[in-house]
């Protein structure tokens, strides 16, 4: 099965991990306009209490997070590092990330995504079996836990 994930929010990354937990052979591709997962320049960010976040997700969903990141208070810095750690682990599990990639078109009848990006795969058309869009305000919908909250910077 081929799963296309649009966006790289914590919720999108959680979704990718859940898919791979259920079926490790799934081909997961994350398309994001961000240059680097975990450090997007947006005016709409998440705050997490890192201690609570790490308790609510499986250990195999994230890699190491620097010890200097405060784990007790809500912060966007903690959310950025958690996103980065979850993305790293997702790639270790076989997911593919297309960074600096803009979705040009989604053909739902053909189950195809047309994209243009700045990475190794500059542009193209990918087929998918499942498409999940976590861009914009959709990025803030929690899948299960409520360890984070949305803020405006």
Question: In which residue ranges do the predicted regions lie?
Answer:
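Short beta-strand/turn micro-motifs composed of small residues
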Residues: 7, 32-34, 135
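Class I S-adenosyl-L-methionine
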Residues: 17-20, 87, 91
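Short beta-strand to alpha-helix junction loop
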Residues: 69-89
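Predominantly flavin-linked oxidoreductase catalytic cores and closely associated redox partners
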Residues: 28, 93-153
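Hydrophobic alpha-helix position signal
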Residues: 54-56, 90, 98
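Surface-exposed, flexible loop/turn segments at secondary-structure boundaries
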Residues: 11, 36, 139
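N-terminal FAD cofactor-binding segment of flavoenzymes
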Residues: 14-70, 80-81
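Beta1/beta-strand and adjacent pyrophosphate-binding region of the FAD-binding site
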Residues: 1-11
């Amino acid at each position: 099965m081929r799963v296309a994930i649009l966006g790289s929010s914590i919720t999108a990354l959680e979704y990718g991990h859940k898919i791979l937990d259920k079926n490790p052979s799934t081909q997961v591709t994350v398309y994001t306009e961000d240059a680097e997962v975990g450090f997007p320049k947006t005016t709409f960010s998440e705050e997490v209490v890192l201690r609570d976040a790490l308790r609510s997700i499986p250990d195999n969903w994230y890699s190491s997070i620097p010890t200097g990141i405060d784990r007790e208070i809500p912060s966007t810095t903690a959310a950025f590092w958690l996103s980065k750690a979850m993305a790293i682990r997702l790639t270790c599990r076989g997911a593919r990330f297309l960074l600096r990639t803009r979705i040009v078109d989604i053909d739902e009848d053909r189950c195809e995504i047309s994209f243009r990006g700045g990475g190794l795969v500059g542009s193209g058309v990918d087929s998918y079996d499942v498409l999940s869009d976590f861009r914009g305000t959709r990025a803030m919908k929690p899948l299960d836990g409520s360890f984070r909250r949305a803020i405006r910077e």
